[in-house]
Every structure is written in structure tokens, then in C-alpha cells.
A protein has these predicted regions:
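Regulatory and partner-binding modules of innate immune sensors/adaptors
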Residues: 1-436
């Protein structure tokens, strides 16, 4: 029968009372909880604030030195918990205790180095824990102790400490990133899950300052793509807003040619991604920095203006037509011979706002079925449905999102939209093409 830590002793461990353990007859490393936490794990996990004194930790390790390296069921040693909860003074004590031990004669690695690199069941080191929880003081201690050899290896999820820090928000985050960048003398690992890098992460959260710091260290990160072929610029284009395109600007400042990078499957560039998201300011910045990228089309022959139509946002489409480089795309045909206005003709059947765009555009041309824009508008349901289905097939976003474009689907938004269309149609006359 398994015997677990006595509840009274557990409480003393939580509170950091050494006296009950001072003359305890059983070895302290045999006092375990069901998760195999030792009294040090219990103590460190219970401290919501950094302990003012390291007395309890010092005295326990004096009495039972093996506890320094003893792991719980998750493979966590006391250093993992001290790093997670930001107990920098305890981290120093643990490292000093490890330094006092003799170096392994075979490997030549000191016990302190060995402890710093120990991983839990998810392959997280103490540095991973400190970075994830934004413990800048702990990160400073850990990175300085293990340089210049520190490898910054990835955990089972492919996350390096730098990637974890770049992915998060909150206080101390910038200091964590600065400490890692400053104290890494050897090769720095920027990697993250699914081929992403810390620059992808910074782009996703809209952090232009971190993006600039990373590029100052490693400029080629602008061309590093994830497993789907998305560059950091793809992420910045996707996550930018009408008001904030700061990361897009930084990435293009360092490497405007990143706008030429097309993803693996659908061959969409960052301009396509900005278009489907309706991020017109990001589109303006991309075409101003790399004008020729407008010529790139996806695997269906769609240019950026086709994607703006797929975004279903008339105001964005009108704004794009005011940009000369994008306005020229309105007559360009895809692999089926459809211009962006052929797509609009299908939408105009069910949406008065698109009907207004259609009749103001005055674009002509036949697709490969010999159908003009007027033919599609006046066509049968099958022709219209085929185009509407193509507008739905715009691919996936990052992190496995099923759709890129976010549409108004709930009943409340639908009613508001119908009311707006009705109001605008009453206030602004719209010409109608006579159906044949």
C-alpha cells in the first residue's frame, strides 16, 4: 500500500515551517504526494509571492541534498517551480547548491549546468517556464548562468523559450525577450511549432518592437516560412487592423521582397491575405513597398482584387480602386476568365451594395464560357451558385482556422445589414440592367 505525505506535514511544507522536519526520522525524499511532489515542490508551489527568506529551502537541502534533483510525476524538479512562480532568490540558492557539487568526470558538465538543462515530461527547461510566465529576473539569472553554451532547445510542442516569450502579452514580456537576446552568445534558436519562428509569433500579436529586435539579430527571418508556407508578413497581413499596420511596415522595411513569397498550397501572398481580411491599409503599404507583387496570382489565377470581392466588403473594394496599382487589376482574369467584376455580378444578385459597385464600375469582358458580367448578373442560378461557391473557397488562416474571412452570420447582424441596405437603396437611386 502506497503511503503519502501526512496532511499535517503537508501543511507545514506549504507554510515553510522547518521545525517539524528538523528531527524527522524518515528520509525527506520519501515524503511524497500522489503526484510525487516533495516538500520542496509543495512549498514552492504554494508561494504566491517571492519568499522573503530562503531559510526553508536552505535548511531542507542541508538535511536532504537529493531533493535538489528529485522530480515529480511530471518530471519537474524544484528549479522548474521556482522559475514558474518567479522566485528568483530561490533560483539562486538552487543553482549555488548545484555548483557546490563535483563536476561529472565523464561528461565534464557541472551539476549546475545539468540542472539548468533538465526537462520535464513536455521537455520544458526552467527557462521555458520562466519565459512562459514572464519572469524576467529569473530569465536573466538562467541565461547568464548557462551562457555561452545554452542551446535554447525546443520542447515537445516545438516551442523555444524565445518563441514562447514572443507569443505572449503581459508585464515583463519585453524584458524577458531582451534578456534572452542579450545573453545568448551562441546560436540562438528562434523556432516554434509547425515551422513558425519567434518573428511569426511577434507578427501575430502585432509587436513591431520585438519584430525589429529579432530582425536586427537575424534579418533572414523575413523569408522563413512555416509548414504551410506562410512568412511572417503573411501573419502580419492577417492580424493587422485598419489602424495598426506597424509590423507590416517593419517587415517590409527590412525586406520588401518578402511580399513575393507565396504559400505552399493555394499560392497566396501576403497581399492576398490582407485583401481577404479587408485590411486595406496593409494592402497600401505592401504595394507601395513592392509594386510588382500585385502581378502575383493564386492557384486559381485570382489577384488581390478577386480576394477583396471574396471578403464581401464593398467599402474596401471601393478604397482599393482608388489605388492605381490595384485599380489595374479589375480587368485581370483568373483561370476561368473571370475578372473581379464577374464575381461581383454574382454577389449583386443578392446584395444591393454590390449591385451599386457593379453599375459604377463599367468593366466589360467575357470569361471562358463566353459569359459577360451582364450575362452572369442576368444568368441562371447554376452559374451564380458556381461563383458564390468559389468565393467561399478562400482557404485557411494560421493556427488551423477554417475560414479566413469573418462573415456576419447571426440573425441580428443579418437584420441590421438588410435594414442598412434598404435605407441606402431608398436614399440613393440605383440603375438596373434590364434582364433579357
Amino acid at each position: 500500500m502506497t503511503t503519502y505525505m501526512d496532511p499535517v506535514l503537508f501543511k507545514h511544507a506549504e507554510e515553510g515551517h522547518f521545525r517539524p522536519f528538523k528531527n524527522y526520522q524518515t528520509r525527506l525524499d520519501q515524503l511524497l504526494t500522489p503526484d510525487e511532489n516533495t516538500i520542496l515542490h509543495v512549498y514552492l508551489g504554494n508561494q504566491s509571492r517571492e519568499p522573503e527568506s530562503t531559510y526553508f529551502v536552505d535548511k531542507i537541502l542541508e538535511k536532504c541534498p537529493p531533493l535538489l534533483f528529485q522530480a515529480n510525476k511530471k518530471g519537474e524538479i524544484p528549479l522548474h517551480l521556482a522559475a514558474r512562480y518567479g522566485h528568483s532568490n530561490v533560483v539562486k540558492v538552487l543553482i549555488d547548491r548545484a555548483k557546490a557539487r563535483p563536476t561529472d568526470p565523464e561528461s565534464g558538465v557541472t551539476e549546475a549546468k545539468k540542472m539548468l538543462r533538465m526537462t520535464n515530461e513536455e521537455q520544458d527547461t526552467a527557462l521555458h517556464e520562466a519565459a512562459r510566465n514572464r519572469r524576467s529576473h529569473v530569465v536573466e539569472i538562467l541565461t547568464k548562468e548557462d551562457r555561452p553554451e545554452l542551446s535554447y532547445s525546443a520542447n515537445v510542442h516545438g516551442e523555444t523559450p524565445l518563441y514562447i516569450a514572443a507569443s505572449s502579452w503581459g508585464q515583463e514580456r519585453e524584458k524577458v525577450i531582451d534578456e534572452i537576446l542579450a545573453n545568448c552568445i551562441s546560436v540562438l534558436d528562434y523556432g516554434g511549432p509547425n515551422g513558425r519562428t519567434a518573428l511569426h509569433a511577434a507578427s501575430a500579436v502585432g509587436d513591431h518592437e520585438t519584430a525589429r529586435k529579432l530582425l536586427a539579430k537575424e534579418k533572414k527571418l523575413t523569408k522563413t516560412t512555416d509548414d504551410n508556407g506562410w512568412s511572417p508578413l503573411h501573419y502580419a497581413a492577417y492580424f493587422s487592423t485598419w489602424l495598426n499596420i506597424s509590423v507590416v511596415k517593419v517587415l517590409l522595411e527590412y525586406d520588401a521582397s518578402a511580399a513575393y513569397i507565396a504559400e505552399t498550397e493555394k499560392k497566396r501572398t501576403a497581399l492576398h491575405i490582407a485583401a481577404i481580411q479587408g485590411h486595406v491599409n496593409a494592402m497600401k503599404e505592401i504595394v507601395s513597398r513592392c509594386p510588382a507583387c500585385c502581378e502575383l496570382v493564386d492557384n486559381r489565377g485570382w489577384n488581390a482584387l478577386h480576394y477583396v470581392v471574396a471578403s464581401r466588403r464593398t467599402e474596401v473594394f471601393k478604397e482599393c480602386l482608388r489605388i492605381p496599382l490595384l485599380d489595374r487589376l479589375k480587368t485581370k482574369k483568373d483561370d476561368k476568365g473571370n475578372t473581379p467584376f464577374h464575381l461581383i455580378a454574382a454577389l449583386a444578385n443578392e446584395n444591393m451594395l454590390w449591385a451599386r459597385v457593379l453599375y459604377e464600375g463599367e468593366v466589360y469582358g467575357l470569361n471562358k464560357q463566353k459569359l459577360s458580367i451582364k450575362d452572369i448578373y442576368n444568368g441562371d442560378l447554376a452559374e451564380i451558385q458556381e461563383i458564390l461557391e468559389s468565393l467561399e473557397d478562400v482557404g485557411r488562416g494560421p493556427f488551423g482556422c477554417r475560414r479566413i474571412v469573418l462573415e456576419e452570420t447571426n440573425e441580428k447582424n443579418k437584420k441590421e445589414k438588410d435594414a442598412r441596405i434598404k435605407h441606402e437603396s431608398l436614399s440613393t437611386p440605383v440603375k438596373r440592367i434590364n434582364r433579357i
